[in-house]
């Protein structure tokens, strides 16, 4: 896959992650009582360390690429450095200082590739860029949902025409609209709105696109 393919898929997957949360919302109870949310799990992530979570608005800006994601990751505060079997608490430290050997908690210690891999594992945006795209929006559900989610993603992202249609659908949404949808979905799910449309209507369009993508790949 190409560089442009990564950017296109990252943008579409980020924009649609709240919709996926709404479709697969499945955590309305806490300790056997209604908690006021369709997806409590999604609400919890809304209130988790903003330095390492969220909708990555920079991904929609001109110049987005692997380097920009690396810059973002470098700016995320560290949790730990592992040496042997020991985890050294360096919470809040700057990874760039570790690259320079100037980490106050471990002076002279320099970053390794393992340190970088460990650091990347502590970043939890709605979609995490790895050697693949890790989409984090859906709650766990029954078996039918477990198989429906990869079918939806395959239909959207593995067929070029479907991906282009999905990109056209989400392109008019602004960063503020995407963020407002992300905030609304945990409680409202498909009753939320974006771009003057209710999310349920948008979901129908997305499912139609995904079905077309699956059909073109010989899947039904």
Named regions from a protein language model:
Residues 3-220:
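C-terminal accessory/tail domains of diverse enzymes
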């Amino acid at each position: 896959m190409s560089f442009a393919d990564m950017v296109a898929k990252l943008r579409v997957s980020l924009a649609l992650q709240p919709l996926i949360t709404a479709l697969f919302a499945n955590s309305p109870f806490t300790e056997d009582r209604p908690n006021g949310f369709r997806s409590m799990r999604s609400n919890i992530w809304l209130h988790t360390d903003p330095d390492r979570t969220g909708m990555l608005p920079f991904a929609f800006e001109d110049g987005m690429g692997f380097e920009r994601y690396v810059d973002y990751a470098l700016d995320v505060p560290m949790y730990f450095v592992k040496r042997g079997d020991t985890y050294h608490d360096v919470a809040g430290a700057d990874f760039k200082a570790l690259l320079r050997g100037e980490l106050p908690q471990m002076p002279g210690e320099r970053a390794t590739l393992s340190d970088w891999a460990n650091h990347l594992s502590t970043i939890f945006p709605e979609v995490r860029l790895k050697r693949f795209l890790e989409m984090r929006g859906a709650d766990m559900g029954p078996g039918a949902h477990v198989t429906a989610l990869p079918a939806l993603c395959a239909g959207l992202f593995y067929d070029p025409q479907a991906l282009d249609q999905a990109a056209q659908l989400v392109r008019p949404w602004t960063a503020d609209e995407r963020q407002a949808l992300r905030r609304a979905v945990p409680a409202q799910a498909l009753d939320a709105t974006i771009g003057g449309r209710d999310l349920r209507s948008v979901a129908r369009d997305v499912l139609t696109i995904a079905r077309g993508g699956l059909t073109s790949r010989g899947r039904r």
